[in-house]
């Protein structure tokens, strides 16, 4: 009678069992992050706990004082987090339109500077005034208030010359708001809170000086949403817009696109 090889069968059984176990191993469960706003939910949870504590009638006086201080600190922290996330969202949303406008303004500014080299008399005065306006425009783009929806320097109706009756009211309001911010930029430049020659600091990244004062907010003013400037998807067609590439004297030195340029300041 031939011998029975039980050892090989045992090995085969073990191999089969190990393969089965491997195939049935649970794959790691990659849960998506609960929130794209890190820290916000934790702060809100802490706020609820503190408010529940303060709601107790028999809470000791010293504990109440401590809880009230904690409440104020948490509320301030939550406000900072929400503001930071609002700034980030707006920076991402308007990155493209601000980039192309910065290119346009920088080219115009360089053209004026070249013309100034050979100008004199009244022409020189006009060019100096124009140079100041272009520098205001450049600071406008670089240092626009971070918590406000961006109002374009060159809205679609200006770029394409299409002004309808329906858009006139919106355009008037938008123009007023734009000019208010430009005036704030001028004042900040006069106070040395913003650079008088912003073109010399392009590409300096996080080291770029920022306005030391914030643009005064108006609680009653609502961002314009009807005009083309404040569309839900700003800048979608801006890459193909000839307006941003039709300068008569292109100096060939276009501004390079930096990673997280304006919004990461």
UniProtKB/Swiss-Prot annotation:
Ranges of compositional bias, category Basic and acidic residues: 185-195
Biased composition (Acidic residues): 237-265
Comp. bias intervals (Basic residues): 21-30
Region annotated Disordered, chain positions: 1-46, 161-180, 185-265
UniProtKB keywords: Coiled coil, Nucleus, rRNA processing
Origin: domain of life: Eukaryota
Coiled coil start-end: 55-121
Composition-biased stretches (Polar residues): 210-233
One of the Pfam families matching this protein, by short name: Efg1
GO biological process: maturation of SSU-rRNA from tricistronic rRNA transcript (SSU-rRNA, 5.8S rRNA, LSU-rRNA)
Any single Gene Ontology cellular-component annotation: nucleolus
InterPro entries: Efg1 (IPR019310), EFG1_rRNA-proc (IPR050786)
Compartments reported by the entry: Nucleus, Nucleolus
Family from the record: Belongs to the EFG1 family.
Summary of the function given for this chain in its UniProt record: Involved in rRNA processing.
UniProt-recorded name of the protein: rRNA-processing protein EFG1
Gene: EFG1
């Amino acid at each position: 009678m031939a011998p029975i090889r039980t050892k090989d069968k045992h090995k085969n059984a073990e191999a089969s069992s190990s393969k089965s176990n491997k195939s049935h191993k649970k794959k790691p469960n990659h849960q998506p992050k609960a929130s794209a706003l890190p820290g916000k939910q934790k702060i809100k949870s802490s706020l609820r706990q503190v408010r529940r504590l303060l709601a107790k009638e028999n809470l000791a006086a010293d504990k109440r004082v401590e809880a009230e201080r904690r409440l104020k600190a948490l509320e301030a922290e939550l406000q900072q987090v929400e503001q930071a996330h609002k700034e980030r969202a707006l920076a991402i949303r308007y990155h493209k339109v601000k980039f192309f406008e910065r290119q346009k303004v920088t080219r115009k500014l360089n053209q004026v500077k070249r013309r100034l080299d050979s100008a004199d008399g009244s022409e020189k005065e006009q060019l100096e005034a124009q140079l100041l306006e272009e520098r205001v425009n450049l600071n406008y783009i670089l240092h626009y208030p971070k918590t406000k929806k961006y109002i374009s320097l060159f809205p679609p109706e200006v770029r394409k010359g299409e002004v309808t009756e329906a858009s006139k009211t919106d355009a008037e309001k938008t123009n007023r708001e734009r000019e208010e911010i430009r005036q704030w930029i001028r004042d900040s430049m006069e106070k040395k809170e913003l650079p008088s020659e912003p073109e010399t600091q392009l590409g300096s990244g996080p080291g770029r000086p920022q306005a030391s004062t914030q643009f005064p907010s108006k609680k009653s003013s609502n961002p314009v949403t009807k005009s083309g400037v404040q569309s839900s998807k700003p800048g979608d067609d801006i890459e193909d817009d000839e307006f941003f590439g039709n300068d008569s004297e292109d100096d060939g030195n276009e501004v390079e696109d930096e990673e997280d340029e304006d919004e990461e300041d």
